[in-house]
A protein has these predicted regions:
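A beta-strand edge to alpha-helix "cap/lid" segment located at domain peripheries
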Residues: 2-47, 55-146
Length: 146
C-alpha cells in the first residue's frame, strides 16, 4: 500500500468521520487492508484489528485460539512465510446485528503461479469504543473436487 491510503487506525475509527461511514464499506476495507499486509508476510494487520478477547479457528491448528496474545504468538510463527502475488475477495457479505457484524467471503490467493488456493472465511466484528474489532475468525480450506 502506498502512503496515501488510510491506516488501520483510520479504519478502526470509522475513517475519522465520527462513526457515520457505512459499516459494510468500513469492515470490507479493514479486511482488504489486513489481507494486503498478510499477502506480504505481515500478519500484524489482523492482530491490530482483533479484539483482546478474539477467538480463532483455522484448519492448521488443533484447537481454538483464545485471545489476541495467543493469536499474535501463532502469527509470529508464520510471519514472513506467506507470499501472495494477488488475491480475490469473492462475494463478501456483511450482515449487521446491533453492535455486531458478520463478514463472510470466499478468498482465492495466488502465490506467483496460476495455482489458486481457495478458502472460506467467516469473521464476526464487534463495534466497541475503539471502532470495529474482530471477535471471532474461522478459516476453512476448500479442497479440490477433482
Amino acid at each position: 500500500m502506498d502512503n496515501m491510503e488510510p491506516s488501520m487506525e483510520d479504519f478502526v475509527n470509522d475513517l475519522g468521520d465520527g462513526g457515520k461511514a457505512d459499516p459494510t464499506a468500513v469492515i470490507i476495507a479493514m479486511e482488504r487492508a489486513a489481507l494486503d499486509r498478510w499477502g506480504k508476510g505481515d500478519p500484524s494487520g489482523f492482530i491490530e484489528i482483533a479484539a483482546p478477547d478474539v477467538v480463532y479457528f483455522d484448519p492448521f491448528i488443533d484447537r481454538r485460539l483464545d485471545g489476541r496474545e495467543a493469536l499474535a504468538a501463532y502469527y509470529e510463527g508464520i510471519r514472513g512465510k506467506v507470499s501472495v502475488s494477488r488475491y480475490e475477495l469473492v462475494n463478501p457479505r456483511v450482515q449487521l446485528v446491533g453492535s455486531a457484524a458478520v463478514l463472510t467471503f470466499n478468498y482465492v490467493s495466488y502465490s506467483g503461479s496460476e495455482y489458486a488456493s481457495r478458502w472460506n472465511c467467516t469473521e464476526v466484528y464487534r463495534r466497541s469504543q475503539n471502532g470495529w474489532e474482530i471477535i471471532q475468525t474461522h478459516w476453512s480450506y476448500q479442497y479440490s473436487k477433482q
